[in-house]
Every structure is written in structure tokens, then in C-alpha cells.
């Protein structure tokens, strides 16, 4: 079952990502193959069963499909600021015939969207938090943390800058090129990468596991929220 909602007026940030939506899948495959998808799904088979799942900045829906397969019967809320990205996610879900759960699509800018408090036992933000400058990132994490149920899991996959050379130089060059491209084509607000760890820790989340890939450029995280969910392992 699929439901949709649109909240608020589209921002420049939302509208600009619409143009990339039809091309995002082939661009990802051309530049990274299946590496990003492996990061998105790194912990899906390890985390406890989730009943209420929040996917923010989901984009073209590849993690959404896998969550529907892994957590059948769960309720999923998929939020994205780009209507065209949401359309891609809907199409992918229908094509994979994975809609065996309740999926609600919400067209909203996360900076202006207020989720239900203490509701979701799984939050996922894959290749999304890198879109924000520092003050925006702090607001986004604070807002999403309110939505986390006690003991919730927070999965995130993203880029990072390794601490050691020559990996550090390589990652800096790649990220510089990426930010130039996305700032030019999408009016991305961030000029550089801001690690979310500090803000997650402030909200009571603790890093449970981290996997790195691609010479340290990519990482997949499993964070755990404060409190007990009753089914954490």
C-alpha cells in the first residue's frame, strides 16, 4: 500500500534536484558501480526487526526497496525534497513489486518538516547528510532525533575524509570535484563535508558499528539511540 503527501512549497534546493532525478541511477552506476548500494544496505541484515522506518533523503529508492524486502509488514515513511526523486522511488518500488508494506511518500524539505516524536525504531539517512552546511546539519539531526523511538537504530552511509595519507589527499580531491558539481547543478548549500558524529552524540546516539570502503572514502554506520527498545541485540 502506498500513500503520498506534499508539505509546504518546494524550495530551490528541492526543485534543483528534480533535474538530476531521471539520470541519478546511471550516473551512480557509471561513477561507483554498486559501491554506494553496498554501503546503504551494509547493516540491514544485522539490525533488529523494525516496525516503523523513516527514510530521509532517500532519493531514487534503492534502500527503500531493500527495506521493504527485509522488514515485511513494517510501516515506512519516505521523505525527500525532490518530487522527481520520489517519483523515481515509487516507480522502482512498483517495478520490484516490493510494496508488501505500508509506504508513505512525503514531499518535504527536512529543514521545515516535523516528524512524529518518539515513533521510528529505524532511521536511515544515506548519502544525504553531506548535503548540509554545519548549522543546517545540526538542525536536521536534532529534528530527526526527536522522531527516534527509545533504542532506535540510525543507519547512515556517506563520504568521509580519512585521517592518513595518501587516502586523505585522494578523498579531498574527489569530494572537491563532487561539491563543485552538485553546487553548480543543484544549488547544494554545503561547500564542504561536515561529519555528523558530534551532533549524533549530542542527541544521545552512540556508534555501534562502522564499515569503511573505497580507501576510506565511504563509510556505513550503525548508530544506536538512548533507551531500550526491547529487541536490540
What are the residue ranges of the model-derived segments?
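A short SAM/SAH-binding and catalytic strip from SAM-dependent methyltransferases
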Residues: 122-136
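A short acidic, Gly/Pro-enriched loop at the edge of an enzyme's catalytic core
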Residues: 113-123
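Class I SAM-dependent methyltransferase SAM/SAH-binding core
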Residues: 54-55, 59-112
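Core SAM-dependent methyltransferase catalytic element
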Residues: 203-205, 211-233
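A short glycine-rich, Lys/Arg-flanked "PGG" loop and its adjoining helix->strand segment in the class I
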Residues: 138-150
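N-terminal, positively charged/glycine-rich alpha-helical extensions of SAM-dependent methyltransferases
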Residues: 1-22
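Conserved alpha-helix/loop element of class I SAM-dependent methyltransferases that forms part
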Residues: 33-50
